[in-house]
């Protein structure tokens, strides 16, 4: 599997990182992403780079970011559907950033999406679109549209 382009990821992340109200919420998102990144038993270099980029864009200092790898915490509930969709997409990007998609990651991301209250049919469809995409990146507008369609 091809690696995701980190420059393109940075551009996408810049579009989807906004909207987190408190530092505690941003840390919670990053903790969830760190836990997801090591679900296959190891942290790949590209996953580490990706997480570092996310931390930077969330305004989390490097020392605090590194300390998060030694913390365990239940993620805070994400209040708005838009923010839950953003977090789902960040996790999906993280799943593909190392060029490998493990079965454990597929199962975990589906459960996380259900726990966040996202429609399982839509999340499966988005993951299928990402799987079929050469770059593994789907425009955020297309993802939002998929979730809007479920409400109609």
Name what the model sees in each region.
Residues 1-36, 42-152:
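Small-residue-enriched hydrophobic alpha-helices in membranes
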């Amino acid at each position: 599997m091809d690696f995701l382009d980190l420059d393109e990821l940075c551009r996408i992340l810049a579009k989807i990182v906004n909207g987190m109200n408190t530092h505690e919420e941003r840390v919670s998102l990053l903790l969830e992403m760190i836990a997801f990144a090591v679900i296959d038993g190891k942290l790949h270099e590209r996953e580490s780079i990706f997480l570092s980029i996310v931390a930077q864009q969330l305004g989390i200092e490097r020392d605090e970011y590194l300390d998060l790898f030694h913390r365990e915490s239940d993620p805070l509930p994400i209040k708005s559907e838009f923010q839950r969709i953003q977090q789902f997409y960040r996790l999906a990007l993280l799943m593909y950033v190392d060029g490998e998609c493990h079965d454990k990651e597929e199962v975990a991301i589906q459960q996380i999406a259900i726990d966040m209250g996202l429609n399982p049919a839509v999340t499966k469809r988005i993951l299928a679109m990402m799987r079929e995409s050469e770059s593994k990146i789907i425009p955020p507008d297309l993802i939002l549209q998929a979730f809007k369609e479920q409400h109609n």
